[in-house]
Structure formats: C-alpha cells, structure tokens
Amino acid sequence: MQLNPAEISDLIKAKIENLSVNAEVRTRGTVISVTDGIVRIHGLSDAMQGEMLEFPGNTFGLAMNLERDSVGAVVLGEHEHIKEGDTVTCTGRILEVPVGRELVGRVVDALGRPIDGKGPINTTLTAPIEKIAPGVIARKSVDQPMQTGLKAIDSMVPVGRGQRELIIGDRQTGKTAVALDAIVNQKGTGVICIYVAIGQKASSIANVVRKLEEHGAMEHTIVVAATASEAAALQYIAPYSGCTMGEFFRDRGEDALIVYDDLSKQAVAYRQISLLLRRPPGREAYPGDVFYLHSRLLERAARVNEHEVEKLTNGEVKGKTGSLTALPIIETQAGDVSAFVPTNVISITDGQIFLETDLFNAGIRPAINAGISVSRVGGAAQTKVIKKLGGGIRLALAQYRELAAFSQFASDLDEATRKQLEHGEVVTELMKQKQFSTLNTAEMALTLWAINNGSYSDVPVAKALAFESEFLSFVRTQHPEVLEAVNASGAMSDESEKTLEAAMKSFKSSYAYQA
C-alpha cells in the first residue's frame, strides 16, 4: 500500500479548516448560605429570573430572587449535600419538563421524572413550565360540553371545554371524588386528563392511581405527584409542570382536562419559599403576588381557535380547535370562603362548585350546594337535551330549600306547598350519585325527563334511587334505540318521548315500588 504525502497533507488541512471550537460561556458563583432549601449565591451576575442553576451532585435549583450582590435560589429536591463555598453554574435555560403522548398512563414527579417503576419515558420533547397564556385573539368561546357524568353538575353547573371551574369545600367533603369522576367519565371521548396532586400523602396518591387503574382511566391520564414529604419548591412548580403537559395536547387541536388537587397547598408552599427568601409578607402572611401565582396558571386553561392551532403546529393540524379545561380544587377552613386564597381563585375562575360538610354528613353526595354553585360560561356549552330538561332542577331545589325552612314553623300546609316539598325531596334524592357510577347524556336525560313529567309523584322518596336504577335498566334492555338516538343527536325527539311514556307506563305496572 502506497502512502501519498500530498493526500495526507490535504486531509489534515481540510480537518484544520473545518474544526469548530465553540466556547460556551457559563457564569459561576459561590454558595454563601444554605437554609431550608433556600440557597444564597454570590457571583452570578447574569442569572435570569426562573433560570435553572446547577449545583454539585447533579442537583438543580431555580433562581427566584435577583438582588444587587447575590441571587436567592430554591433547590429542586434534596439540599443536605450543598454546603457553603460550593460552586454553582448558570445553565442559561429556563426550567423545562418532558411533554408528549409517552407520558399518558404514567405517574411522574414535578420535574416529569417517572416514579411508577415502569421504566424511563421515551420522549425527546420538552417545554418550559412557565408560558404566556393565549391572547384574546387566539381564543375561541366555550361552546362544547365537558361531561362529568354527575347529574347535579351537568344539569345545574355545567362545565365546558376550555373553562376553569373551581371545586371548593372543607376537608372531607368529596372534592377529589368529584374530580376523579370527571376524569373517569372522559373514557372513550379522546380527552387526555392530567391529575396534579400537591402536598398530599403518598398513600393517598397511590390510592387515587389504583382507583383510576381499576376503572380503566389511567389509559388516558397523566398523574403528576408532589407529595407532602417533597421540597416546597417541587410542590410550588407541580401545577405549572402539569399545565405544560396539558398544553401540548391543547396546542395540537385536542382536548385536555387538568385537575389541581389542591391549590391551597401550592399557595402554602409558595408562602414558605417567599418567607424564607425574605420577601415582605402581606395578608395571612402570603406574599403580595399570590394572586398572580394562581392567575398566570389558570389563564393558561383556554379554548384556542383553528388559526392558533394551525400556527402552533406549523400547518400540520387544520380546522381543529384545542382546549385545556381546568378543575382547580381549594380547601376551605370551617366553610370560610372569604379567606385570601379562596376569594382570589373564585375571582379568577369561571364559576365554582361549593361542597358542604352538612350536606355530605346528611348523605347527599356529591354534597353540592345548588344555591351558591354557579357556572358562568357552561350554559353555552351544555348539551341541548340536558339544558332543556335540567332547567327546572335548580328552581325546584331552590324553592324546596325556601319552603323547607318555613315548613318547620307551620303546622298545616296547603296541598300545593306539600306537593312542592315532596317534589323537592325527590329531586334532592335523585341528585345523589355513588362515586364512579357516572352516567352518559342519554341516561342523565332519562332521569331528568322522568322528574319533569311527574313520574316520581307516586314513588316514595326512599325508593326513588332504586326506581331510577331499575327504570334505566328497563330502557337499556327494552328500548336501547332511544338511548342511542339521544346520545347521537344530543336532543330528545317527540317520538322518543312517546316511546318513553309508554315504557314508563309498562314499567310501573310491573315494578313494585310503592311503600
């Protein structure tokens, strides 16, 4: 083999000419102090607000306070190994989390790392946890229903796709149960759900995951968990991480539902961080920007129009709108909704579902107070048949409550008042629903239709739920075409009503329901 010196020299010349030496400039600083997961660093002159900082031992932190001679940062995870004098490096990147379809069916921590023991998540896509919410022009009005499968909610406080509906109540009133029912009810609808657990016991989160698996809901759900034992910084960023994962689907013309359980604990974690960073405390010792903490998160839940989706997907998806629906949960203390955080979130959201301890203890579950629960935009998104049939439900309950208060003092009641009270009792009874026993549009319409046409007037209150269940089974077996037609069209035709009237007559003649 002959070596050609000219060729070798040409090769070496070409290598030298094509050699690229990219020098990366990264600012370094020194740890001055470490206290409760808060690190003060000197020498990071060009750190950005919210930038990721790298500590020794492959630990990362978040720059939060940019002062004249130092930077205050929170450590995302364990901080025990960080000591005074350690070197800290700027990464030049804002905190990002993995996004994509690969996350569906998995349980991840606040940084998107898997914690379910099912191996790594193979996604190459990441997105920043802090994003600007869609602008006014990019949005579209809410006009599609997000069915929860709960009679009391879908008939009285309907939720639309792209809406923010607050679930508020004391501890142990069934807030999480309502949210989980909404997640389970999305099975087969193509809606991707994200459940963000903030500051909860690890055992409670494991129980939620088990329940979702049992009902086949993990197939369309991502669980983001920041347990009570984790650093306050992780509890603070968990909702933003979950929101970013949901926005991935929204921006591709799909529908997503996100549950924040609960934002009270996130506010407490943020208060802890702020006080340790020596930011001035305000009302209830919360920092001045606690309203902005929740508003910038909840404003990201929206319905975006076709042009925005087309722009975000570079023309790949055309003619589709995307939505991210938020169900934030707030825990009140002794029913005090006038506290700082509850009033903030009530003013940010598009309505609220109030759950009451007294109703819960009386066996009315979901324990929804129909009088003060509202949906400010959901009416436009309600299914036609539910809107038509459910209109009288709220009125019946409101009148019943008013009359029930007066009837305690009156000894003899006239016939009309007595009938109204009996009707109200039956409606209250029929609004009860067991957990994970959600109904589809047609089944719900069937119950509302029976209430409206007086079919329950001769049914004892104690047997109302059993009567409802048996009648549903009867129609499912004898007249499935009626249910299919209502589900397909979202309306009840005159023909369907006639069929149901005949079915009710036939059912009543064969079913022993009288006391």
Curated annotation (Swiss-Prot):
Enzyme class of the recorded protein, top EC level: translocase
GO cellular component annotations of the record: plasma membrane; proton-transporting ATP synthase complex
Topology of the protein relative to the lipid bilayer: Peripheral membrane protein
Site (Required for activity): S373
Residues binding ATP, per UniProt: G169, D170, R171, Q172, T173, G174, K175, T176
Gene Ontology MF: a single term: ATP binding
Enzyme Commission number(s): 7.1.2.2
Intrachain S-S bonds: none
InterPro entries per UniProt: ATP_synth_asu-like_sf, ATP_synth_asu_C, ATP_synth_asu_C_sf, ATP_synth_F1_a_nt-bd_dom, ATP_synth_F1_asu, ATPase_a/bsu_AS, ATPase_F1/V1/A1_a/bsu_N, ATPase_F1/V1/A1_a/bsu_N_sf
Catalysed reaction equations from the record: ATP + H2O + 4 H(+)(in) = ADP + phosphate + 5 H(+)(out)
Subcellular location: Cell inner membrane
Keywords: ATP synthesis, ATP-binding, Cell inner membrane, Cell membrane, CF(1), Hydrogen ion transport, Ion transport, Membrane, Nucleotide-binding, Translocase, Transport
Pfam families in UniProt: ATP-synt_ab, ATP-synt_ab_C, ATP-synt_ab_N
Main location: membrane
Function summary: Produces ATP from ADP in the presence of a proton gradient across the membrane. The alpha chain is a regulatory subunit.
Family according to the record: Belongs to the ATPase alpha/beta chains family.
HAMAP family hit by this protein: ATP_synth_alpha_bact
Protein name: ATP synthase subunit alpha
Organism in which the protein naturally occurs: Neisseria meningitidis serogroup A / serotype 4A (strain DSM 15465 / Z2491)
